[in-house]
Amino acid sequence: MSMSIALHAVLPPAAATPRRRPTRLRASSTEAPASGEKGQEDTDRKSGTGMRRRRRRAKKVQEVGLEALYDDGFGEATVRDYFDALRATPLDGGGGGGPPRWFCPVECGPPAVHAPPLLLFLPGIDGVGMELIMQHKSLGKVFEVRCLHIPVNDRTPYEGLLQIMEESVKYEHNLSPNRPIYIIGDSFGGCLALSLASRNPEIDLVLILVNPATSFAKTPLQAILPLLEMVPSNLPVTLPHLLRYLIGDPLKMAMVSIQNNTSPQDTLESFSDSLSSMLPLLSEFGHIVRMDTLVWKLKLLMSGVDYTNSRLNAVQAEILLLASGNDNLPPSGEADRLFKALKSCKVRYFRTSSDRLLMESSFNLLTVIKGASMYRQGKQRDTITDFLPPTISEFKRTFGEDFKLLHHLLSPVMLSTLRNGKIVRGLAGVPDKGPVLLVGYHQLLAMEITSMAEEFLREKKAVLRTLAHPVFFVGNYEILRQELSFFDVVPLYGGVQVSPINTYRLFERDEFVLLYPGGIREALHRKDEDYQLFWPDQPEFVRMAAQFGVTVIPFGCVGEDDMLEIVLDYNELKNIPYIRETIESFNQDCPGVRSTVKGEEGNQVLHLPAVLPKLPGRLYYLFGKPIEMKGMDGVQRDRESANQLYLDIKSEVENIMSYLKRKREQDPYRSITARTFYQATWGVTAQIPTFEP
């Protein structure tokens, strides 16, 4: 992909003139309302009319917005494109220096969502501003992206840079005071972002910090800074060890674009291609950057680090800190220090990645933001309207790599029931359009969810909006700080906190809703409780489904007893002193559900049972005959009718599981050994047969 600086909309110097209104960069359907319309909205907000109008508008936006498995363009750009862009960029500001300036990468294109938030990228100490190039297309779908470029020969001091950015941020905030401003700070840019947030606590900022250089004072380079000042100022910086602090380590940068699953020959070819593209650039960059420039950059970094560390306690912004494991500048433990010092901070570690995290071929920044539940368009995150559907690249990564082995071990069999009662393989019996409510049994450790989410996306292109426990959304359980934990996968693939209001809103938007009435009592059941339902006597979802004409599909799944064996359940764990205190402490901090429900149905204690794996069997699903709730007005008014339908659905789920337990005995490929032989004969992509329904 050839690039040139002419392909980027370079805006005037940031301190010179204000930028255009964000709405002028978007389609007319997403422009800000006129003053009269805004006044009407304020009036309507106080009445039911405004609520109905906003709902209709939200539904309309959903219809023309992003669809599940949309192409986000991630992976199209490579490190070589970064080198090409760097070569085409006038690093010295066109020969005359010049103040810092903002530019809009054309690769981002027009945003595909309604009223996207603004995203500002602050570069590292090199100041080029192109380090985000491999993320441009994916971020450009949901953000309005602008990047800061600081010419090599620019001598704006640290507080001068802050003033430039502050003017821009305040201008944008005045244009859209109810929308957040995202700031991505890479290395030195992380210091700028934190300093900016400390000076403007009243502005709604969301900071994405990538290996912030807040620990530069502890690095060896600071110790040799006095020696560098003694070197002649006009001497070109040609030493790779010094250049790597500006544009990175050549060998590491050549390696970041190599895919993990490529052959040795392709790996060598890709590495050679990247390195050959970079070496001429190093020579060019080395002749542009003089020793006095390097010394200035390092002093600028030192002043920024000192300024930032002295004001960490004043930062009020929401923060996502991304730390790679073998980074150059932040030493081990810096991410933990910042996590403790900052008020609202989430951390994600990428222990096998280099310090050039943004240019890793497998690193998708938008996926990380979505998984951490950090994407929002208003002052508060709305899990319904702010949800971004999974992309095709996320689908391939999650189910083609992360859960590939699990899918192979489970070898799920999906069956559904047509309206005439015939059972077929696949999801043909499930409607193609919502609103649909899937109600069923929660297997041990929720092992059935990933396969269901994959199959509905693959066959129906439908996102399952799982009504999940609040533990996935409330609280900051950062003990699971890793690249992609299950806590991130749940919101990434449509999970929302279980509540009547969220269920109501999902039905209103014609979504596919997944409900487990048994909750974690079923998913964390005790010994000898396999396939036992723990449904409370609360048929409210039936009445709500009737109100919206929802199609209810009872389903069951079996196979957990072929996969895992419970060694210690909750009744045994609570008798072990240390473990008992840990469970009690965790549940005290965690918001509970069903506190008013008596009996075992309300015993929703979060814990982790000790289990042992078995020689894998197989997972079986059966989606029952659809129950059309449209026209069932009597269910809404008559509680007795609602209770009876609720019991009928529960009975159908139990019958489905009894059917599957009986029929799986007839499956010749229930054992993983038989399935392995079959795939060895017919190929790993061949669908493995099962019993005749």
Residue map of PLM features:
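Flexible "cap/lid" loop of the alpha/beta hydrolase fold
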Residues: 198, 202-253
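Catalytic active-site module of serine/aspartate enzymes centered on a nucleophile-bearing elbow/loop
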Residues: 7-11, 71-94, 343-388
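Short beta-strand/loop motif that positions the catalytic acidic residue
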Residues: 314-316, 321-323
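Conserved alpha/beta-hydrolase "acid-adjacent" motif
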Residues: 328-334
